[in-house]
Structures are given as structure tokens and as C-alpha cells.
Amino acid sequence: MGRRSLVRDTIQVLASISTAPVASLRSSLLYSRNFQSYCLGYARSVSGPGLPSYDPHAIESARQAAWRERDAFGTPEIGEDGARKYIKPSAPFTSGNIHIGHVRSYSIGDAYARFCRARGEQVLFAFGFDSFGLPAELGAIAGKEPPSAWVERCAQHMTAQLQRLGFSFDWERTFMSSEAIMYRWSQWLFLTLLEAGLVYRGTGSVDWCDTCQTTLATIQVEDGLCWRCHNPVRLIQRPQWYLRISKYVAENDRRLEELQASGMWDENALASQRFVLGRVDGIELDLSTADGEPLTVFTPHADALELARFVAVSPRHPQVEEWARDELLAQRLEELRSGGLERSAREAQTMPLVDTGRLLASPTGGEPLPVVVTPTVDGRFGPTAVLGIPERDRTDAVIAERLFGPPVDTPTAGDEAPAKTHTTRTGVSDPVNGVPTREAVRYRANDFTISRQRSWGTPIPIVYCERCGTVALAREQLPVILPLDLTPTGTGNPLAEREDFVRVTCPSCGGSATRETDTLDCHFDALWLWIPVCVPPGEREQSLEHILALEDLRAWLPSERVVAGSDSGNFVFDQRTITKALRDIGPLEFLKDGEPFAGCLFHEMVIRDGRKMSKHLGNVVDPDELVAQYGADTIRLAVLFAARAQRSLNWSDSDVKRCHRFLRQVWDYSQARFALDPASAAEPHDANGSPAEAEPRMGPDKTEHLRNRLEQWCETAVEKITEDLQELEMHSAVRNVMRLFDRIRDYEKRVIAKRGVLCAEDREALIAALRTLARVLIPFAPHIAEELLISSMPDGRSEIDTSWPAGELVSR
């Protein structure tokens, strides 16, 4: 080795030990002559061929092959020892590609799953593809192929992407919701809830395109026109299937206090549940018309009753049906419903408004209050009746203007709370003019439709018979099979055109009948299909009764933690509803509080330049390209490092480069120390690289003190990282891993700067600290971490200990 190259290598050694810029190392007083001599000798010993460079693709390929060979992430048998944790990730739509939001979500869940396994806990970490629904149908229409072929191809591609990223899912338990063996559970759930009165048939508004002869989802209506033919869309009334969640809304609200007290639900998740609930506290009071017809009304403004100008009633209020017996009023109500009862985009100025002609006595003795029916009530208070107080509510002000003309002072768009004038403070239990008031709560959350007029979805197990009416199938007749060769075109419903599907025999009387051709919304599938993940793959084809009796459900439920995007609030709320219903019905009676998830983390989305990623804006980040350039470990580490899960991640290439640089530094530094011959490293050299006399050794107490300090640094780091992982604070955990690496390098710098050599005990402590570093790195960058542990083993042994360190230095 030439003198010039040796000096260059020495500077690189200094840089690997210190975080200071290389230029400053030449003049730093921190580095003594002995330290420089050590580095010259060190560079001489490790330079040349044989020291492995960081090749993420080779490392990741090797580790993933090893994981597959030993089935590293298979779900343990429930009889095995150890605490059990079902970590539930979100179910991806079979959209064709994994996006960076998926990478963030699954990196969080995977880090936690690996951490739990390392601590000796039994982990179930698996998911199913959400392969039914509109996205798959639209993809099939574009490709002019059956949706079954589209979703199969998408699932295969997405699985390969996820496997390249090294996520530790139990792939044997992966499934697609469009598989008959799985969607029979959705049909079972439908029948179970139908028998309990929690599923019912009603009438609702849908968007309809006369040209395409099909119903449209909200996203398919663009400025009132059909997305496909660009002709006008109109709202029609048709029968729909509804899920009655109203029975459990109050319990879902009440249980939130317990979930918050547990400390395992983050504030994002709790806030989403409160938002879905839409709870409003106030009072209710009983009013009546001049002829004694009663109506209970609600208001959140107990201190402004004398300002009431009218009463607004939801079209879904039960009393509206009574009023509909009046022929003229019934016609007006029908016009209201056909005019867009469930169009949330409509404003109060254009929302339908029907004057019932009824007048209620004012609670404060003022002018009688006209009663109007308007869907503006539903979006604020649910299907109820409310006092209209224009001076307190902007929507009420708009309705009052439509009823009575412009007021002298109208609340402007910027007014959050119109000025209070001449109000009398009224307690929630005080009578008003002899009319008693009661504390009351209203919720925006209410029953919703679960059926869709589309072909690619779970068939509804219902037939229609002229003699028997609506007939539910028996559970023994499940599953009702969806034809796999359906090819939707965007016009009509191909399922309704299949005679082999539609024409059946009535299971009740044996006569002719027709099947229901609506299908279940994929949202309904999601309410239950996370539970069959608990069922061993070998048991999936057993009868439903057999599966429900398995101990596996009791062993894995409730899920210890769910990790999902912040837009999953409705899914989680409705899953909480379903588990409470099945607790009461019987199949999940062992969930005493009815809660499906002991803990919940909602992470925010990944954005770029402050905007949501989209192909239209050209700011999409392709995970495949990133993995090809930097490797999976770098991308996983970057999405965890860049921001707390509860904050939006503003994508930056600099974060990726920083994490890649960190992993390369850890690799190069560790490999060099593992490969260093202790005898060569302990031999001091002078500035010319020639042997030199070593300076006197430090006293044994001082040497022990430095090693003890290193051990304390490791213990502190492990404690902090453990706490971070338990709280799913991945951002903080990664930073603490990085700090530990800095501490390890600082240890070597301090010892060598003062003594010029590493004695055997010092080197052993350094190697042990690097093993600890590798083990705490496993949850975040598992491939490189395991490979480092293998490199640290003497004689090339490949058996490594990946258990979670207790904080002590790991000597073997």
C-alpha cells in the first residue's frame, strides 16, 4: 500500500468513527498522535480485498430466501407458550400497485410485529386483499376482461411488491375477499344480522344514468353528468338493504372513555371515532300543535329557546311517515326524497324543503313555529326534529330566510357563532313556560345502505318469490356463488342478465323465484373479513359452525393493535358495531366489552410538496423505483424516520438519502470492526506507518469506566427504543437507534484517542455493542441487521440470536 493511499484510508477511518466533517479531522485537537497511529495501523489491517461492501439487493435477497426456507413468520399454534398478539394491518384494494402510503402503514405494523416476536410473544400478522368493489370493476371495464382476472393479476403483483419490501406477513393466511370460501362469511353475517333485525330493507335515493341504464357511485358523477357517457344523471328511489347501527351508537360512544384510559388508542383514532359519532349534547322538550299533536324536538342551544323560529324534521323521522298519509303532503315528501335526500354535497340554499302546514306552540310563548321537513337535519343531528334558531346556526339562518325572507341581520359565511341577543339562560332540567326539558344527546352516525347495484360484489343471499315474498336462504345453502366470467361494460347490470344466476327455486315453497341481483358493498365485507384471518388455512373449508367453535378465535381476539390510515374511521367504527352485535347474538360472546381492537393507531397520509400525491399532479413516488435504487431497508427506515405516524409525511428525497447513508455507515463501520484482527489492531504505528512504542496503558479503573459507560449507553438506548416501540413511536425509535450508533463510535474514539490501542476487553465491548445495535435495528431494517449479526459471529456461523436485548452488552 502506498503512503498516499494509506493516508487517505486513515482519514476514512477517522470519518467512520467521528460525526465531524472529514476536513476538520486533520486539525482536530481531539485526536492525539497515538490515535492517528492507531488509525494508520487500522487502515493498514482492513484495507484491500475481503471486506464486504454494502449491497442491499444481495443482502435482502439472501435474507428473504432464508425467511422463506424456515417459515420465519408463520403464525404459531395457539397451544404454544407466550403472550399472543394479533396485529391487524389495513386490507389493500387490489388496485394494481402498492403506493408509498402502503409502505408507511405496513412498515409501522411490521416493525411492531418483529419487535413482539423478538420479545418471545406469539404474533399473528396477516391480511386479506379487499378485491370486491368499484375500483376492480372499473379496472376490468378498462381492460375489457372479467373482474376476477383483473384482481387475480393485481393481487399477484402487489404480493410480489410487498415481499420485495420484506414485510413479515404470514403469507399462508393471505386471501382475497372475492374468493367464495371467504365471501360466504359476508353472506353469513348478512343473514345473522337480518335475523336479529339489524339488517333491513328500505327505500333510498341512488344516482341513475338513463343512457347507461345503471346506478352510479358518487365518484362516477362529475358535475351532474355520468363519467362514461357524459349525459345527465338523475336521482331515483329504489329498494336498498340497510345496516342498523343506531342500536349501538350510544355504546360505541360510551366505550371511548375506556379506550382512551387504556392508553393504547392514539388521539387520531379517538378523534376519528368522535367525528363519525357526531355527538351533540343539548336538551329535548315536548311541543304540540293546536289540536294536540305532539312532537319531541331537540336543540343544542338551551339558552336560546326564545329565539326559535321554526322546527326542522328529518325525512327519516318516524313521524314523517304518519304525516305522509296526507295525499298532498305525501306527494311533496316524495318529491323531496327524489330530489336528493342523501346528496351531502348540496347546500342549505338548495336542499329540498317541505312545509308540512303544521304549527307547534313556541316553548317560550312566542309566535307558533312552522314545521318543515328537510334533509339538512340528518347531516347535523341524525333522523330527529330540531328547533331552528337562526341566530345560533348558519344553516338555520338560511332556512329561515327561505321561509320568512331576509332578516335585518343575517349571519355571514365567516360567522362561527352569531351574536346572542336577548337570550335567557335556561338549565337543561329547568322547565320553560311550564314545558319540562330533558338532557339529551343526538348522533350524526346512523343506519346506512350496504347494497350496491353492481355486479362485482358478494351476492346477497335473498330470493324473491311471488308466493312467499322475500325469502332468506338457509346457512347450509351458502355460499351463493358469483359467476367468475362476468364482464361488465359500464351499461346495465350483467349479473341481472344472467338467467343461470337469476332464475332459482324458492327454498320455502319450491316454486319459481328470482335472486337478489344487488350485491353487498365491499365496506360490508370489511366489517367481518379481518376475523377469519384468525382461522388456520387448513380449517378454512370447514363448516361455518365448526370454524366458529374453534379456540383460535378466542385465542387471537380482540386484535391487540390495528394500524391503518386516518381515513379508516368509518371502517373501525362499524367494525366496533358489528362485534358488539355478534357479542349479543352469540358468536363473539367472549368479547365482553364488544371491542374488536385493544389498541389502534391511525397514521396520516404521505404527501409531497404539501399536496396529496396523485398521477394528475405528477408527484407520485414509486416504491419499486426506490427499492431498485436504494433497497427495501432504506425505504422502510425512511418512512419511519421522516415523521411521527400521527403527522403527514411530506416526502423528501433527502430523508431517503440520509437513511441510506446511515445504513451504509453502519455496515462499513461494523464490517471493518468484525473483520479486524485483534493482534494487528493492538499494534501501534507511528505517523509513517512504522511500528511504534505504545504509550502507557490507562489504569484498569479508567478502562472499566469507559466500558461501563458504553454499557450504560446501550441499556439506556434499549430502554428508550423499547418504550418507543410499545407506543408505536417509530420516528423516535429510529432516532434513538441512530444516537446509539453515534455513542458506539464515540466510545471507540475516546478509548483510542487516549491510549492508541484497543485492548481485548475494549474490542469485545465494542463488538458486543454493535451486536446490540444490530438487534434493535431489526424491526426497522431487518435485512441488513440480521446480516450484520451473521457477520459478527466467529467462524462464519449463521445461527444468530435475534431476541430483543434486555439492555446489556451482547457478547455472543
Question: Which residues fall in each region the model found?
Answer:
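Helix-rich, typically C-terminal accessory recognition domains appended to large enzymatic cores
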Residues: 195-207, 299, 304, 439-468, ...
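Basic, alpha-helical terminal appendages of large translation-related enzymes
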Residues: 34-82, 314, 386, 402-413, ...
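Amphipathic alpha-helical
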Residues: 251-278, 314, 318-351, 478-481, ...
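Active-site-adjacent bridging/hinge elements
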Residues: 81-89, 162-166, 367-371, 375-377, ...
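Short Cys/His-rich metal-coordination motifs, predominantly Zn2+-binding knuckles/fingers
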Residues: 212, 229, 365, 466-468, ...
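Structured ligand/cofactor/substrate-binding pocket environments in proteins
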Residues: 101-113, 130, 177, 184-185, ...
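N-terminal, positively charged nucleic-acid-binding surface of large information/translation enzymes
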Residues: 39-319, 372, 390, 402, ...
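Low-acidity, Ser/Thr- and Arg-rich intrinsically disordered low-complexity segments
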Residues: 3-8, 16-19, 24-28, 32-33
